[in-house]
Every structure is written in C-alpha cells, then in structure tokens.
Amino acid sequence: MSEVAHSTVAFGGHFARELPELAIPWRAEEAPDPQLLTLNQPLAVELGFDPDFLRSPEGVRLLVGNALPEEATPVAQGYSGHQFGWYSPRLGDGRALLLGEIAGADGKLRDVHLKGSGRTPFARNGDGLAAVGPMMREYIVSESMHALNIPTTRSLAVVATGRQVQRETLLPGAVLTRVAGSHLRVGSFQYARASNDMDLLRRLADHAIERHHPSSAGESNRYLALLKGVISVQAKLVAQWMLVGFVHGVMNTDNMTVSGETIDYGPCAFMEGFDPGAVYSSIDEMGRYAYRSQPVVAEWNLARFAESIAALIHEDEEQAVALAVEALNGFRQEYSAAWFSGMQAKLGLPEGIEDDVASPLVDDLLQLVQETRADYTSFFRSLGKAARGEVEPARSQILDLAAFDSWLERWQALNPDADAMDQVNPIYIPRNHLVEEALASATEGDIGPAERLLAAVSHPYSERPGLEKYAEPAPESFGPYRTFCGT
C-alpha cells in the first residue's frame, strides 16, 4: 500500500471520476531505491510544487507513485490505436499511470502521469518498466520542444528506481514524471466507439471539449466543432515539426492527442542532413512515418478520429460522413498555411509578400538544400548571417554555387529581417549524437552530459560562447542513426 505524501499541490481525479469505463484504478510498483536523477525546477514551481519537497525522500517517492496524497486516484487509462496502420482494439497504459490532475495558475488542468511505473492490466507481454536512457531521452527532447515553442507534453522529473530492467542487456530502471494538458488521444475515442456505448463516447467528447476546445461548446454542432478544433491544432503542430526537422517516428493513433501536444518521444530524432525521406525508427521498416510523410499520416489519423465520433456529429450516417469529410478537407489547407507561414518566417520575409514571389523562393531553396543534404538546422541558422551580408557560412554548405548565388540575389532583394530569423531558426537542437552520448553517460550514472545538453537546448535561439559542440552536426564516424522505442 502506498504511503501518504504531504504534497503542496492537490491532485484531482476528473478523468477517473468522469470516465470510469476508461480508467482502471491501479498502483505503481514499489521502487526498491528511488533516487532523483533530474528535476525540472521551473516546471515544478509553475505547477505549484515546492522543489525542495520534491527533492526530499517523500517527494521522490511521490514522483514514482509510491507515496501519494490521500486524494490522488491513480489509474491506468484505456485506449485503442492503429499501430503502423493495423488496428489494436486494446492498448492502454501498459506501463504508465495517471496520478491525477492539478490546476495551474491559469485554472487549466494538467495531468501528472508516470511512465515506467510497473505492469498494469493493459501490459500484455511487457514488463511495465522503463530504463534510464529512454526516460532521459523524453525529458531532453520534450523540454527542447517546449523551448522551441512547439506544443508538447512536459517532463517534471526522472527518478532511478534502483531496479534493473532486462532489455538486450540489464539496464538501470527509471520512472519519468510527465505533465500534459491531458492524455486524451485519438485512440481514446476509438476505444470508446468500439464499446458501442454512446453515452461513454458523448461523455468523452464533452470532457475533451471542456478541457481543450471550450469554444466548441457554444457551436450549434459541438462535436463537429470538436473535430474541426482537433484538425486545426494537429495541422499546426505537424507543420511546426516539419519546420524544425523533427521526426516523431511512431505516429500511431494512440500517439495523437486531441489537445495538439506532441506526445511519446520513443524513437524520435531531429533530421540533420536534409532528406525528405528520413526515417530513424528501427521498427519503421517500410518508412511509414518518414519525415515527408508526417502530414499525410496526421490526416489519416484524423480520419480515424472522425470515424470514431461520426455518430455524435449527426444521427444520419450519410450526413455525418459528409460533414466529417468536409471538415477533414480543411486539414491540408490549414497545414499548408501554417507551414508556409513558418517557412516565410525562417527566411525573414516581410509580411504581405505575394505568394507568387515567396513560393518559388522557398521551393528553389529546399531543392538546393536537398541536393546537397545540407545540415537543416545549421543551414537555416546561417541564413541569418547571410541576411547581414556574411554569406559564406551558408554558401559553403551548398554544392550548386551558381544556383545558390542566383537565389541569394533574389532573396536579399526582399530585405530579409535577420533578427526575426534568429528568433525562429534555432542554433541548438538535441542533436542525435549528443543525445546518445548523454543517455549512455546517464545509464552509467553520470548525469552531467544530459544536464549540459539540456542547458543548451533550453535556450535554442540564443548563441552562447562555449557551446559550439552543441551547434555542430554529428561527425562522420557517428554513422547512420537508428532509434529504438525502449519497451
């Protein structure tokens, strides 16, 4: 039985109370020797936690779910999902627990969630555990995404459990404490719809509207408005991924949130040499979730969401389908508008520029960058210098110099805003070789490299002396990069 923790923050049980059909009450496995590896102090303060309490033995036990406030109602959440296109009717939190929700200063609820806390009834054949490396990966990358102003779940802490985890070798175990607007997924709706319980589906949709799309409540068709709201936030989210070269790696429907937050950083990576076909996940053998495919997959996932709530949109099936298809047809326009606006910002182009000027400028540049496999992040950052007249850092990354010089002339004639470019083109991202270096050290008990990498990527747009290694592409000796989900 869990100890009672005297937290400075009250835990609510809104999801568990309102949607008991999707929540199995459960407790985290006892961690033999929990030790705090890293704590996100700014986030802790933002949530109302006392960081000193979270660093105490009692606080650390709270972070692994072994000491909870009396009001906490931890549950494993149920959901379905299409994984690599194949439907799995019963997935759920196999190694995770929702401890409850806490109210932020803005009044919005935030989930506090554990990952790697032990087997649940949804575990299937898994051991329910997680290793230090994958949990530190999610901490580093999610906090980098937050610093890049991309909607994401957050990481509050990583705690080593003192338990060994069997993977290819024995690895030190860990629990990640994750914070999110919610953990409502497309797969949550697939699970509810498959139950044929329309009351449950309606309550789930109303819960999503209240938490993430409150403006939908005032619409004449609130569930159609919910669909449009989720389409909109996902179109903008995936556009932001594409603009920074982020490859999620496992865009299953259970990894698409209705809040529009990025979730699940298992086999993710940041693209270095620009390659639209980039795939990093070791399990994505067919390239389903390649960089260039992410918008297409997002649209496909949203169609599965529309199918799940179609019966709420209209009682007549034909009319429901027609309304849903019309809403889905808006995805490509919203995505394209968000991506193109972001690309114009990356090039420092003035507002109001005509599309027939900006569009070929963008297309021609990306063709040059692709032909050279130039480092995506470094190249766009170097364009800020080119806008100030220092063209060689960018020029040196392109093979077809005559074509690039011609492009430069067209671009510079538009007076690009170098300062604005530096606010959207990062210099520091979680480069894959540095992430692997940090994870290897953390696995061996040295958290220093991870902390230094976090310090760099937490301020991605501000160039600082002494951090040159964090701005450099991987050395050739690093070789082709492959990622693993860690389960």
From Swiss-Prot:
Q: What class of enzyme is it?
A: transferase
According to its UniProt record, which residues of this chain constitute the active site? D254
Which residues are Mg(2+)-binding? Answer: N255, D264
Keyword line: ATP-binding, Magnesium, Manganese, Metal-binding, Nucleotide-binding, Nucleotidyltransferase, Transferase
Q: What does the record give under GO molecular function?
A: AMPylase activity; ATP binding; magnesium ion binding
Any matching Pfam family? SelO
Protein name, as recorded: Protein nucleotidyltransferase YdiU
The species this protein was found in: Paenarthrobacter aurescens (strain TC1)
